[in-house]
Regions:
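Alpha/propeptide regions of enzymes that mature by internal proteolysis
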Residues: 46-49, 101-127, 134
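Generic N-terminal amphipathic, Lys/Arg-enriched alpha-helix
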Residues: 2-34
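Active-site cofactor/substrate anionic-group-binding motifs, chiefly glycine-
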Residues: 60-113
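Long, hydrophobic, well-ordered secondary-structure blocks that form the structural core
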Residues: 129-161, 166-168
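Phosphate/diphosphate-binding glycine-rich loops and adjacent basic-rich segments that engage nucleotide
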Residues: 159-204
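General beta-strand structural signal in soluble alpha/beta enzymes
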Residues: 122-128, 149-153, 178, 186-189
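N-terminal glycine-rich anion-binding loops that anchor highly charged ligand groups
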Residues: 16-23, 36-62, 76-87
Length: 204
């Protein structure tokens, strides 16, 4: 981007710095106003804030207005609780009941870890949910608890297959995480050069 354009943008949209605690408090306030139970609201506010704080702006607070819009348009049920639909040993299928994707994904990651303690592996599928925001959140959740994690989601068809013209494939996020000492090594990537959220970030 040419320097003069950058300066012009900054003149119109000055940078405002706020603390992470202030950011999280404001997100929490809005979620409570939208009818979230306090525990659920605090969890979501923490995830949105940490995503931004850790540099993943494309899936942090930048996505929060859309999350609010989904709630206002009844696409997210703030009171929904995920429900087990099918179980076979180390495999489970859960119905997210159109609840917040963050909460549903955290729950299913926890279930996968519980299953792996029993069977050595846990495979959990989740349907009828909403955007889980940053996939790496759940990789960190599992790896820091001592588990290897592989996770992905489906999405709309917005990419053509190699050599084709029509959009048929989703730009699905893929997450692979392994424990590393007290931390973790986490791969969190899109299937293309950019995630949709990264492209959106450029327009802000």
């Amino acid at each position: 981007m040419p320097e003069y354009k950058f300066k012009n943008i900054m003149n119109h949209y000055p940078t405002i710095r706020i603390s992470s605690s202030q950011m999280e408090t404001e997100v929490l306030r809005i979620l409570l106003k939208l009818g979230f139970q306090e525990k659920k609201a605090r969890t979501c506010a923490s995830v949105f804030t940490n995503n931004s704080l850790e540099g993943v702006l494309s899936h942090g607070v930048n996505r929060f207005p859309r999350f609010v819009n989904y709630i206002l348009n009844d696409l997210i049920d703030v009171d929904a609780e995920p429900e087990l639909g099918y179980s076979a040993g180390a495999i489970e299928q859960w119905d997210g009941k159109s609840g917040p994707g963050i909460l549903n994904a955290l729950k299913c990651t926890e279930r996968a870890m519980e299953l792996s303690k029993i069977s050595g592996i846990g495979c959990v599928a989740l349907a009828n949910t909403n955007h889980w925001m940053r996939g790496g959140t759940y990789g960190w959740q599992a790896a820091k608890a001592g588990f290897v994690f592989i996770g992905w989601t489906n999405t709309i068809g917005n990419m053509p297959a190699w050599g084709a013209l029509d959009n048929k494939l989703g730009n699905n996020p893929l997450v692979i995480a392994v424990p590393f000492g007290n931390e973790a090594i986490v791969l969190d990537m899109a299937m293309s050069q950019y995630s949709y959220g990264q492209m959106e970030k450029k327009t802000i």
